[in-house]
């Protein structure tokens, strides 16, 4: 049985700012772009969250909810430095580390001899060490199943941890909402609910053939996750190459104005996801994807140095006009391709 830990730093960017400037500690603060530039919130501290300020929220909306919000532009070198220190702490316990972003990672401690091999104690010690050496708090999930570790790390935030033992997995899954499973969005959740499927326990009673017919290969993933099956390794060689976000509509759209409105809603989430792995927003390419009512899809992208909404909208409009051919559109997606480390190093040296 594996021992998987998911460590997630608490409001990481904001926490670094509060650590370095204690005057910010008890007031609402957020990291993000200015209202004038139509920016979005990258992260907010807990005092700001009490007012409803959330990640990926337009800055203008955040300031309406919390007029006295202190908005900071971000110090990404400081965040990267802290992230590297945290990664070094992880490496004291295991070499099997899969970073998901600057502020979260999976650790496989199955073979670790630290803390007498107790994953629970290892997670506690890692969190204590992070606080001792960086004055930052982290939350953790400890489970034998990879995807459950990420869910568990959110259960006792902030500055806590949640353990699901092998004996507890089955009972935990019985009542786990399907919307908690990675990949289950609002549209999929609505389709599942229409089938009477709301929890993993419900899916356990469902015929796999029905799920495959309705959802294709994702139906199998859904069935496996609901059984507590996740055989993916914690991949220490994992190098993220792209970041994307997409939306499948409940009904096909036929007008450009509808597509543009969807892009406006998707863009802040793309920006938030990119900021977690690439705070400076430097990229190699960006592009759009459209899937039509006949299930054919098209992607168009081009070289672009930094995430840019206006360019994405222009690319989408060109794709809409030239490739739709009167068909309805059932999915709209935005994505960026990240710079490979060698290319990024050359770019930095060139600057």
Curated annotation (Swiss-Prot):
Its main location: cytoplasm. Gene3D superfamilies: 3.30.70.270, 3.40.1170.60, 5' to 3' exonuclease, C-terminal subdomain, DNA polymerase, Y-family, little finger domain. GO terms for molecular function: damaged DNA binding; DNA-directed DNA polymerase activity; magnesium ion binding. Mg(2+) binds at residues 8, 103. Monomer. PANTHER family: DNA POLYMERASE KAPPA, DNA REPAIR POLYMERASE UMUC / TRANSFERASE FAMILY MEMBER. Belongs to the DNA polymerase type-Y family. This is DNA polymerase IV. It comes from Escherichia coli O157:H7. The lineage of its organism: Bacteria, Pseudomonadati, Pseudomonadota, Gammaproteobacteria, Enterobacterales.
